[in-house]
Amino acid sequence: MKLTCVLIVAVLILTACQFTAADDMEYPKWLRGLSTDXSERGCWLCLGPNACCRGSVCHDYCPR
């Protein structure tokens, strides 16, 4: 059981490191569709019609 937890944590850490490294590169096409403002980096999971990315922070409401 402990080994399973350690392996899961290791996979999560490696995945986070890959996303951090990929943040310096251009967004893949499938990630561009998740953010309403794909020009900002660091908001790869802004979802919903009112969500947007300003200053690399995801906001629930953005004035137009």
From Swiss-Prot:
It is found in: Secreted. GO terms for cellular component: extracellular region. Keywords: Bromination, Disulfide bond, Hydroxylation, Ion channel impairing toxin, Knottin, Neurotoxin, Secreted, Signal, Toxin. Disulfide bonds join C43-C53, C46-C58, C52-C62. The modification 4-hydroxyproline is found at P49. The modification 6'-bromotryptophan is found at W44. One of its GO terms (molecular function) is ion channel regulator activity. Five different peptides have been sequenced after total venom examination by HPLC-MS. cal6.4a-4c are identical in length but are differentially hydroxylated and brominated. Expressed by the venom duct. Residues 1-22 form the signal peptide. Residues 23-64 form a propeptide. The keyword Metal-binding does not apply. Probable neurotoxin with unknown target. Possibly targets ion channels. The presence of a 'disulfide through disulfide knot' structurally defines this protein as a knottin. Belongs to the conotoxin O1 superfamily. This is Conotoxin cal6.4a. It comes from Californiconus californicus.
